[in-house]
Amino acid sequence: GCGEVEVHLGDARNLNFINDESIDLICTHPPYSNIIKYSENIPGDLSHCDIKDFYKEMEKVSSECYRVLKKNKFCAILIGDTRKKGHMVPIGFNIMDIFLKTGFKLKEIVIKEQHNCSSTGYWRNQSIKYNFLLIAHEYLLIFKK
């Protein structure tokens, strides 16, 4: 049969309207730290955080996800990496570490091809010349509680 569906507008850092261990599946694609702006003036918008604050806020998300997810159920997060000032920032791996420290177990990493990526001309040319890949993917991190 069909069950009832409830929709709430909220923030994944505070899911106080959801009971402990009551959710079967969590799927999220959080706003990346200072990469794509999702709003202009929404307080607490993670897309406006610097990287260190973004990680701190994602610790709150991880804790709330762990609290509301039923045992032996799954949490899936789509997240990618970036470059800042010419250096690679492994956001995906750092988020994976945050969720592991919360208590989740990593079940799977799925690599999703990402289109419309930008890269510096030098590295793009080098990648073509030597047949290697640049950041052109995101990670679908699948955790189990």
Where are these regions (language model features)?
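Class I S-adenosyl-L-methionine-dependent methyltransferase catalytic core
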Residues: G1-K145
